[in-house]
Amino acid sequence: RPIVLLGGGTTRIGDPSGKEETRKILSEAQIVKNIKNIQNVFKIFLKTNNPKLKPIFVNNYKWLGKLNYIKFLREIGRHFTINKMLSFDSVKLRLEREQSLSYMEFNYMILQAYDFLELNKTKNCLMQIGGSDQWGNIVNGVELIKRQSGNQVYGLTTPLITLSSGAKMGKTEKGAVWLDKKMLPPYDYWQFWRNTDDRDVIKFLKMFTDMPLNEIENIQENNINDLKIILANKATEMLH
């Protein structure tokens, strides 16, 4: 069964990966609201009639909010060296550019590793999946679990979604596309895909629709505007 980890605890800190400045600290009310909305979106894409595949939703604030600092340093912190933590791109780039990196953010990688350990112990989670920018954090979790329990676990990452311009698509990036209809109405969501750069249309048809690859190959020489409409229709149907 898929386990959806909601970052009610770690979002209070903010992941520095790929960021040039400290993330804005959200209020408690905003965090609770965001968690609820994110869970509702995941339910749309993970809907199933098979009870064995029904997703499990967990909020890491459940365990991170109860941590004893001294005990955590003794049992978990001792497995992390400053040397290795400084080698991570998210840290190294900030320091090289003489940009601020708070102690709070510096600890994020340890907390994410601890999440994996907790899920392995309580849910028998054997694999963590995330974007490629999370590879280092995932490896930290794999190594922590091996040191703590000897269990063999795995990590799987997917490439970050980028536009032909090289810009990353993400919720904190300018022009992000939101899945929550309260933040982006269905028509605006459709319009986002309709306005896709010509160079990205075929790639996005393969990534964001359930069209068979052979069908996409058969139509890829069609008028580009017709393809954009197909992309917009298919992507919107899957969400709304």
Stretches with model-predicted labels:
Residues 1-134, 139-142, 148-154, 167:
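NTP-dependent nucleotidyl-transfer catalytic core
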Residues 144-240:
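Conserved nucleotide- and phosphate/pyrophosphate-binding catalytic cores
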